[in-house]
Amino acid sequence: MHRYRSHHCAALRKCDVGTKVRLSGWVHRVRDHGGILFVDLRDHFGITQIVADPASPAFKVIEKVRSEWVIRVDGEVCARSDEVINATLPTGEIEIFVQEVEILSKSEELPLPVFGEPDYPEDIRLKYRFLDLRRETMHKNIMRRTEIIAAMRRAMQNNGFTEFSTPLLTASSPEGARDFLVPSRVHQGKFYALPQAPQQYKQLLMMSGFDRYFQIAPCFRDEDPRADRLPGEFYQLDVEMSFVEQEDVLATMEPIMRSIFEEFANGKTVTQNFPRISYDEAIQKYGSDKPDLRNPIIMEDVSQHFYNSGFKVFAQILADDENAQVWAIPAKTGGSRAFCDRMNVWAQGEGQPGLGYIFWRKEEEKFEGAGPIAKNIGEQRTEALRIQLGLENGDACFFVAGDPKKFASFAGAARTRVGEELDLVDRECFSLAWIVDFPFFEWNEDEKKIDFAHNPFSMPQGGENALECQDPLTLKAFQYDLVCNGYEIASGGIRNHLPEMMLKVFELVGLSKKVVKDRFGALYRAFHYGAPPHGGMAAGIDRIIMLLQGVKNLREVALFPMNQQALDLLMNAPSDVSSTQLRDLGIRMAPTQKNSS
């Protein structure tokens, strides 16, 4: 018999009754029922119940074991009586009557329990991640992560993509966040950077004559903490294709992404044909470029009902600013003063002066609008609003007014809040859509200049002629995002593969030819030697797994994540290094403010 086990802890069934077996694992819990000891023995695969009575030669050893000790047991498979069968366990019809026990390893008092999975402070969980990962939910999350990544690989390979690994020590380049820098010992005073994404490498692969690339790519960004991104390091399904237009990429990746969601949806429905929604439409209808389409609320421009109306606040806003609009946020079933007042309080908590509203009641076959706005704009305008929005008895509507560029984000948050408060959101589906036609440039108010809105390497719609003739702030890019349930899960674009157009694009944001050649020299050089039209995308693996597992925190689906302060509590990183290491790198630490005072 094997030194440690003949079977794993999820393998044995009723057909194995009478078999002599050997199992090894962790003591999940110990129970004493009238002098008979029951031990749940756990390994990676599952749990098997071990039984010892005082007549067992192993009884005295079993009496000593505690939670999370590692033991080896020899015994005989016995059938459980009908009244004690555990239908929730694959091994629930049997138990092992123990004959011999060996203690392989002991555990100190646990800083967090493995059995029962109560809520525990996250910092404790991260510091003792090796214990946290023993818990059933976390163990399943990580195994599901592995399965999803394997499914991604299979899907990509089945669609003619080849997996390449690109370098992790590369040059620093501005891609929207700070780089993690690695000092060079050989070339002192110079630094490598960990890649924020394999963007330039994957484009260079296309220029090297390869056709369809993918990679499960680690990405490193020194960003301030964000709730929807792991600090420091995350993984993406990175993709690039040669000789493609935008629709080619979408048509190729849509069935791949749909198949991943369908395989792991756990009974939830998945969008079959992903709608294409323009960026402008997404902002106007949903107040977000990553809308949650499970929420049926669609916002509408209702400005026409407020021009020269009795509601002077909105009427004055419209009169003073030609860009001003009034947007309506319909709230089916939200027609109570208590709910409307609650939303008003929420809006004030978001830093807004309030949230105007109307709610409708039907009195003797006639709809009546209630609330200050209805009172001020009059019966005729109130009814016209109700008809435009398709609202009925017991429904409500909230309003925001001003320049949409300034209030769209708040309006989107209000739409989300209304949908959640009224339980309008369909929790049993994954609702996916492509967001297309992103603006190429945006105005940087802090620096008073034009800046890239998204990816600087994308092709402008209209090409060189548009760059020459159009107001840059009106230019659209061949860029697209894939969104699901209110999250951006992938982003991509058709690349600019023409060197002169590349220079023109960067010139518009104030970067000279010299700067472009210094920062993107390899890409710029490659463009001069026959660059194919190409495009691709990158999907956030951690975020996709988070959605599929139904958790709210990315750290629940990552193996050894940092906390929100970018600290690795398990490995105590970042940490001090020795003066010898610094000297080898030619680095001297500047005195801190505390030391210099």
From Swiss-Prot:
Annotated positions for site Important for tRNA non-discrimination: 33
Matching InterPro entries: Aa-tRNA-synt_II (IPR004364), aa-tRNA-synth_II (IPR006195), aa-tRNA-synth_II/BPL/LPL (IPR045864), Asp-tRNA-ligase_1 (IPR004524), Asp-tRNA-ligase_1_N (IPR047089), Asp/Asn-tRNA-synth_IIb (IPR002312), AspRS_core (IPR047090), GAD-like_sf (IPR004115)
Underlying gene: aspS
Localisation: Cytoplasm
Keywords: Aminoacyl-tRNA synthetase, ATP-binding, Cytoplasm, Ligase, Nucleotide-binding, Protein biosynthesis
Assigned GO CC terms: cytoplasm
GO MF assignments: aspartate-tRNA ligase activity; aspartate-tRNA(Asn) ligase activity; ATP binding; nucleic acid binding
Region (Aspartate): 199-202
Similarity section: Belongs to the class-II aminoacyl-tRNA synthetase family. Type 1 subfamily.
Subunit structure as annotated in this protein's UniProt entry: Homodimer.
Gene3D superfamilies reported in the protein's UniProt record: Bira Bifunctional Protein, Domain 2, GAD-like domain, Nucleic acid-binding proteins
Function: Aspartyl-tRNA synthetase with relaxed tRNA specificity since it is able to aspartylate not only its cognate tRNA(Asp) but also tRNA(Asn). Reaction proceeds in two steps: L-aspartate is first activated by ATP to form Asp-AMP and then transferred to the acceptor end of tRNA(Asp/Asn).
Gene Ontology biological-process entries: aspartyl-tRNA aminoacylation
Protein name: Aspartate--tRNA(Asp/Asn) ligase
Residues bound to ATP: 221-223, 488, 540-543
Matches recorded under PANTHER family: ASPARTATE--TRNA LIGASE, MITOCHONDRIAL (PTHR22594:SF5), ASPARTYL/LYSYL-TRNA SYNTHETASE (PTHR22594)
Superkingdom of the source species: Bacteria
Organism name: Bartonella tribocorum (strain CIP 105476 / IBS 506)
EC code: 6.1.1.23
Keyword flag ATP-binding: yes
Pfam families: GAD (PF02938), tRNA-synt_2 (PF00152), tRNA_anti-codon (PF01336)
Coiled-coil ranges (or none): none
List of residues binding L-aspartate: 175, 221, 454, 495
Reactions the enzyme catalyzes: tRNA(Asx) + L-aspartate + ATP = L-aspartyl-tRNA(Asx) + AMP + diphosphate
